């Protein structure tokens, strides 16, 4: 081996070896335990960022470790290749989304290879290819036939100038990102998949996911939002239909003083015909996009419709208001308001002077003080007629029963979860495989016409989807009748909901999945990705698995046994204030910094002399220009150094602070390992290790080696605390560097230790370890080498430390053989001069001995 560690030379050679030998390609093998390690597939944006590198390094470390345990390890990679950014980039670069996407894939693939990830490249897939999305289209038509797919009108963002639908991110301050026209809300027909049909199972099966983070499971529970309540029907004077509301607090029903309906509710629409104020309010609501997340913070507004609803139990007439906090697409589009016991209802009632009627006593039994806020806690009823004195449970049941007896209420389980709207009015996505005949009949595209291929050779005008702009593309024939294809495309979450399963059989042509291969590899053993995907992707991912199970393609209930959510990567962020007061963000690479004695940044400027404001560490992002290019770091230090730093700097699930000084430290450590192996191998052949002939010092060093193996095995395998595993290897390396290397058994022990160190480091730094293993004459390639096993006998301590006390005070510590008798320990204690001086001229009256730990001599 060469004396100097030169990653730029060894890494490309090792990568070439892996390519030629197809080292990481796997097939099903029933004789081996399988392990499926999967990182979330990347969007081909053009370049890898450090968040990618962290995610994929964690996955690669786990995959390589499991492989060394002798398992059949699948670690695939692919590209989540459809999506809106490609359309914007195509317009900007005067190209089409397809070539832009494929160029990015080629570039990023080289970047992944440069980092040495052990992927099975034979399974690579790109979700934008017909070979992939054809099966998704076929599956969608099957779900339609099962009644799990339907079409209904739903609100979208509409630009009246461009006559096009806008994604949420294309609406900036209520205006179109392209032409600055005020965006409207428009109802258009869209396709939905009935995820609500699986709501209970998606909720209950969270209990099966023992190895998913509790935070993710809680987020999914809240998103599904199961609640038990009562659906109540109100008659409305002068209105042909009834109003239905759902409440989880029927105990407060006697305090309902008004109803609120969505601006889009038919009752509000009817009332607006003779009410200009209401009509203007409805118009305002129509053109205001309200996400559910904004509801809590926005100003609550409303207009009285003039209609009065009849309280089913008291017979009182209560007003019906149109309000901006009620959404037509949630529930029935109408809510019951109890301002005495709901803070939102209270604020609205206070603002508009509506009646507030308390019906729940305060905790001390007194009438509640509602002068400043509602009483939202549960309690005992009053002011509620026959229900006075009842607690929450009893009141819930009594009022629910009374409403049911009158035929105006029924108990109901509700979900916050809504069906999955999969229509997108974009071009760069998989076409939705549905057609409409001339008579309006909607049918799934026949199987012999699948896939419905998205044309890739298109011209983007940045306004209308090319398949919507081309009337010829939509024309087709079904059953001999003229038909028009659907020109909407799938939500890109569709592709990422089942890719993990297609990896098990990417070349299979008989169907969506090869059940044999899928059931060998699935479920995924560990899935690695960011927590930002907790409720969208990870919920659809679970839902799709259940759909595929019910179609007979997979036999498990859940797609992944374990979920590991890696933390974000942070970096220093700097800016200077420009002439117009704007912030100009400067890359940390270009910041010249001064630090205090504790290493804190106290002053910074850039090459142009601008005084920089340091804002601290924040998530690497384009907006703050604080991303660090992985490629630059690999070219400077080598892939192994970058990987090692990524795994050492922080626990995998915590944020990682990018510090180049830490990268330099990782590089120095690898150079030390390299140097020690070089010096050891330069001395020539090594004799066999004779454990029975080892000195006490040699035994102690060997004990450290095997204790480190045990710790690293536990840290990587069970605890997944990769940073502490690396720290343990570093600690051992410090001891090895000081160990004598002259005697025959010294060198034999060093050989055993270095073979163990190189294998333990291999998942983290595979290029260097591949080369070091060869230099140490390890058997075969390190990629096929077994993980080192700790020798229990080597870890047994020959001696132990005993604390010696005289009259309860510590006077010394002695080392004795582990099997020493009490007499031998007393004798050894007497020879310790620190102890002996307290025994001089006194009588030992009592001896308290805790074997192997404590000797207390009571003297007088």
Swiss-Prot record:
Its main location: cytoplasm. HAMAP family: Leu_tRNA_synth_B. It catalyses: tRNA(Leu) + L-leucine + ATP = L-leucyl-tRNA(Leu) + AMP + diphosphate. One of its GO terms (cellular component) is cytosol. GO terms for molecular function: aminoacyl-tRNA deacylase activity; ATP binding; leucine-tRNA ligase activity. SUPFAM superfamilies: Anticodon-binding domain of a subclass of class I aminoacyl-tRNA synthetases (SSF47323), Nucleotidylyl transferase (SSF52374), ValRS/IleRS/LeuRS editing domain (SSF50677). Its EC number is 6.1.1.4. The keyword Repeat does not apply. GO terms for biological process: leucyl-tRNA aminoacylation. It comes from the Bacteria. Belongs to the class-I aminoacyl-tRNA synthetase family. InterPro entries: aa-tRNA-synth_I_CS (IPR001412), aa-tRNA-synth_Ia (IPR002300), Leu-tRNA-ligase (IPR002302), Leu_tRNA-synth_edit (IPR025709), M/V/L/I-tRNA-synth_anticd-bd (IPR013155), Methionyl/Leucyl_tRNA_Synth (IPR015413), Rossmann-like_a/b/a_fold (IPR014729), tRNAsynth_Ia_anticodon-bd (IPR009080). A motif ('HIGH' region) lies at residues 42-52. The gene is leuS. It comes from Citrobacter koseri (strain ATCC BAA-895 / CDC 4225-83 / SGSC4696). This is Leucine--tRNA ligase. Keywords: Aminoacyl-tRNA synthetase, ATP-binding, Cytoplasm, Ligase, Nucleotide-binding, Protein biosynthesis.
């Amino acid at each position: 081996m060469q004396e100097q560690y030169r990653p730029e030379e060894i890494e490309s050679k090792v990568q070439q070896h892996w390519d030629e030998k197809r080292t990481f390609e796997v097939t099903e093998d029933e004789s081996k335990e399988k392990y499926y390690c999967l990182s979330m597939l990347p969007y081909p944006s053009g370049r890898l960022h450090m968040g990618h590198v962290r995610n994929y390094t964690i996955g690669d470390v786990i995959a390589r470790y499991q492989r060394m345990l002798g398992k059949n390890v699948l670690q695939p990679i692919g590209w989540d290749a459809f999506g809106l950014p490609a359309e914007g980039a195509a317009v900007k670069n005067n190209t089409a989304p397809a070539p832009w996407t494929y160029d990015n894939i080629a570039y990023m693939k080289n970047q992944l290879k440069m980092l040495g990830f052990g992927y099975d490249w034979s399974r690579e897939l790109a979700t934008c290819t017909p070979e992939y999305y054809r099966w998704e289209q076929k599956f969608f038509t099957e779900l339609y036939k099962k009644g799990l797919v339907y079409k209904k009108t739903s609100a979208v963002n509409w630009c009246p100038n461009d006559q096009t639908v806008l994604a949420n991110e294309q609406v900036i301050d209520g205006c179109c990102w392209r032409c600055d026209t005020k965006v409207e809300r428009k109802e258009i027909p869209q396709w939905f998949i009935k995820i609500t049909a699986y709501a209970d199972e998606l909720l209950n099966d969270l209990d099966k996911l023992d190895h998913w983070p509790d935070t993710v499971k809680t987020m999914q529970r809240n998103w599904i939002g199961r609640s038990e309540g009562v659906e109540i029907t109100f008659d409305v004077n002068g209105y042909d239909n009834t109003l239905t509301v759902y409440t989880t607090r029927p105990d407060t029903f006697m305090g309902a003083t008004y109803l609120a309906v969505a601006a889009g509710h038919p009752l509000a629409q009817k009332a607006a015909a003779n009410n200009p104020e209401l009509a203007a309010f409805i118009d305002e609501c129509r053109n205001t996009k309200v996400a559910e997340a904004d509801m809590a913070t926005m100003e609550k507004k409303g207009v009285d419709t003039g209609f009065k609803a009849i309280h089913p139990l008291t017979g009182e007439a209560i007003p019906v208001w149109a309000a901006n906090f009620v959404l037509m697409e949630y529930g029935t589009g109408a809510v019951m308001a109890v301002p005495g016991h709901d803070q939102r209802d209270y604020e609205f009632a206070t603002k508009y002077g509506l009646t507030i009627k308390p019906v729940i006593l305060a905790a001390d039994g007194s009438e509640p003080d509602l002068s400043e806020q509602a009483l939202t806690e549960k309690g005992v009823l009053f002011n509620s007629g026959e229900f006075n004195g009842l607690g929450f449970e009893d009141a819930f049941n009594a009022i629910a029963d009374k409403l049911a007896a009158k035929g105006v209420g029924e108990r109901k389980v509700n979900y916050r979860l809504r069906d999955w709207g999969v229509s997108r009015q974009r071009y760069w996505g998989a076409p939705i495989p549905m057609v409409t005949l001339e008579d309006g009949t909607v049918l799934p595209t026949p199987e012999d016409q699948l896939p419905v291929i998205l044309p890739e050779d298109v011209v983007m005008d940045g306004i209308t989807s090319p398949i919507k702009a081309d009337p010829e593309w939509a024309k087709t024939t079904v059953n001999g009748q003229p038909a028009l294809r659907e020109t909407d495309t799938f939500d890109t979450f569709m592709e990422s909901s089942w890719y993990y399963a297609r990896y098990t059989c990417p070349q299979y042509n008989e169907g969506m999945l090869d059940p044999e291969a899928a059931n060998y590899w699935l479920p995924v053993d560990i899935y690695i990705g960011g927590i930002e995907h907790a409720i969208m992707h990870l919920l659809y991912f679970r839902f799709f698995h259940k759909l595929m199970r019910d179609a007979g393609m997979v036999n498990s209930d859940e797609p992944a046994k374990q979920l590991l959510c890696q933390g974000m990567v942070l970096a220093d962020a700097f800016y200077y204030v420009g002439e117009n007061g704007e912030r100009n963000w400067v890359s940390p690479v270009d910041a010249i910094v001064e630090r205090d004695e504790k290493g804190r940044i106290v002053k910074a400027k850039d090459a142009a002399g601008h005084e920089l404001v340091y804002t601290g560490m924040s998530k690497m992002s384009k907006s703050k220009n604080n991303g660090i290019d992985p490629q630059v770091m690999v070219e400077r230090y080598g892939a192994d150094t970058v990987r090692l730093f990524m795994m050492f700097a922080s626990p995998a699930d915590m944020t990682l602070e990018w510090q180049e000084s830490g990268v330099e430290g990782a590089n120095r450590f690898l150079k030390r390992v390299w140097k020690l192996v070089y010096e050891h191998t330069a001395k020539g052949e090594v004799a066999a290790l004779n454990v029975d002939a080892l000195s006490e010092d040699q035994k102690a060093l060997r004990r450290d080696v095997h204790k480190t193996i045990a710790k690293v095995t536990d840290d990587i395998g069970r605890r997944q605390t990769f940073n502490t595993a690396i720290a343990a290897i570093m600690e051992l390396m410090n001891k090895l560097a000081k160990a004598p290397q002259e005697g025959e058994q010294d060198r034999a022990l060093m050989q055993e230790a270095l073979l163990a160190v190189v294998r333990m480091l291999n998942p983290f730094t595979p290029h260097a370890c591949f080369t070091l293993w060869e230099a140490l004459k390890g058997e075969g390639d390190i990629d096929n080498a077994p993980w080192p096993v700790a020798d229990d006998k080597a870890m047994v301590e020959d001696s132990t430390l005993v604390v010696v006390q005289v009259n309860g005070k510590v006077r010394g510590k002695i080392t004795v053989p582990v099997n020493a008798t009490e007499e031998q320990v007393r004798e050894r204690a007497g020879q310790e001069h620190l102890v002996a001086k307290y025994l001089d001229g006194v009588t030992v009256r009592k001896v308290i001995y805790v074997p192997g730990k404590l000797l207390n001599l009571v003297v007088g």
